[in-house]
Amino acid sequence: MKILVDENMPYVEPLFGDLGDIIPVNGRTLTAEQVREADVLLVRSVTKVNAELLSGNNKLKFVGSATIGTDHVDLAYLAERNIPFSNAPGCNATAVGEFAFIAMLELAQRFNSPLKGKVVGIVGAGNTGTATAKCLQAYGIKVLLNDPIKAAEGDPRSFVSLDTIMAQADIISLHVPITHTGEHKTKHLFDEARLKALKPNTWLVNCCRGDVIDNQALIKVKQQRDDLKLVLDVWEGEPTPLPELVPLAEFATPHIAGYSLEGKARGTFMLYQNLCQLLNITADKSLLDLLPTFNIKAVELATAPNEKALLQLARFVYDLRDDDKMFRNTFLNENGFDTMRKNHQHRREFSALALAYDGQSEVDWLSNLGFSGVGQ
């Protein structure tokens, strides 16, 4: 069995090595000719899976995407061809949630404006939006959720309108899929008019899709309003973001919010489980066995951490400033965006760091935030 796999997908060899011959490929430049003889195709979001790519292949048994979203996959075409498909919903939700939370802590420190006491509006309450809310609520932050689709489906959580978030939130964090049509289309959801309407000193965080914000309009509005603070992990026109926009963001990264070791492993592992199920064989590998030991054994806390100390704990796990600096230095290079993604040293999630503290009940919130070793 020939397993064609994106070269940037981790842990493929230990998980799929027993199932067939693994052929690594560049996901962004993948051609129909390369796919022609594949039995299994494993991709990430940089690969467009459609008739153009697959029409020459009559052997394909399974397509898997190690991603939350599926907007890069023509699902109708796969269904028409009866080709089983699986993605990995929620695989990197924890990573994205922690990234957004860390970015907010970093902004709070940079501008001497504590996160505690602010109101955060989350637009899109799926896996990543929910994970972001979980971090914020663990820390005691008031969260407003906006998701008209979830609300219509009967989700029991309390939802508010986007206008309410615009009026009440100090921070807005975007977590919607990209949709181009329909009542709730998200392309340019934040257009020039909405960007201009942001209340003074709003922090705007985008970890979903670049097209959700009109990037040209964002440049125009930000140049007029220095009070707005931007955290941008995604960009219109990836992998070539508008060069004028990058310097206007407080933190800028190349679509890596979901790039935790745990998240990447989880994505590949979910595809492994689904392929095994399809082939009717036992999935006998373990996710935990894939992950290396974290380089910091444990941190002993003398007192329950304040916000400054919490940021320091977060930096033990992931220092966002490093990726921000590297991105600014390399994004204008040829293939700079993709090269940084490809060579990214995947960070760990909070769960990799064990904390020790005598007054356990005082730090239950750290456990709820995801850290190990403390709390109930």
UniProtKB/Swiss-Prot annotation:
Gene Ontology CC terms: cytoplasm
Alphabetized InterPro entries for the sequence: D-iso_2-hydroxyacid_DH_PdxB (IPR050418), D-isomer_2_OHA_DH_cat_dom (IPR006139), D-isomer_DH_CS (IPR029753), D-isomer_DH_NAD-bd (IPR006140), Erythronate-4-P_DHase (IPR020921), Erythronate-4-P_DHase_dimer (IPR024531), NAD(P)-bd_dom_sf (IPR036291), PdxB_dimer_sf (IPR038251)
The protein's enzyme class: oxidoreductase
Residues where substrate binds: 45, 67, 259
Annotated catalytic residues: 209, 238, 255 (proton donor)
Annotated Gene3D superfamilies: 3.30.1370.170, NAD(P)-binding Rossmann-like Domain (3.40.50.720)
GO molecular function: 4-phosphoerythronate dehydrogenase activity; NAD binding; protein dimerization activity
Stored PROSITE patterns: D_2_HYDROXYACID_DH_3
Subcellular location(s) of the protein: Cytoplasm
Catalytic activity: 4-phospho-D-erythronate + NAD(+) = (R)-3-hydroxy-2-oxo-4-phosphooxybutanoate + NADH + H(+)
UniProt keywords, alphabetically: Cytoplasm, NAD, Oxidoreductase, Pyridoxine biosynthesis
Pathway annotation from the record: Cofactor biosynthesis; pyridoxine 5'-phosphate biosynthesis; pyridoxine 5'-phosphate from D-erythrose 4-phosphate: step 2/5
Assigned EC number: 1.1.1.290
Chain sites annotated for binding NAD(+): 147, 233, 258
A single GO BP: pyridoxine biosynthetic process
Main location: cytoplasm
Subunit structure: Homodimer.
HAMAP family recorded: PdxB (MF_01825)
Family: Belongs to the D-isomer specific 2-hydroxyacid dehydrogenase family. PdxB subfamily.
PANTHER family from the UniProt entry: D-ISOMER SPECIFIC 2-HYDROXYACID DEHYDROGENASE CATALYTIC DOMAIN-CONTAINING PROTEIN-RELATED, D-ISOMER SPECIFIC 2-HYDROXYACID DEHYDROGENASE FAMILY PROTEIN (AFU_ORTHOLOGUE AFUA_1G13630)
Function per UniProt: Catalyzes the oxidation of erythronate-4-phosphate to 3-hydroxy-2-oxo-4-phosphonooxybutanoate.
Name of the protein described by the UniProt record: Erythronate-4-phosphate dehydrogenase
Protein source organism: Shewanella baltica (strain OS223)
Organism lineage: Bacteria, Pseudomonadati, Pseudomonadota, Gammaproteobacteria, Alteromonadales
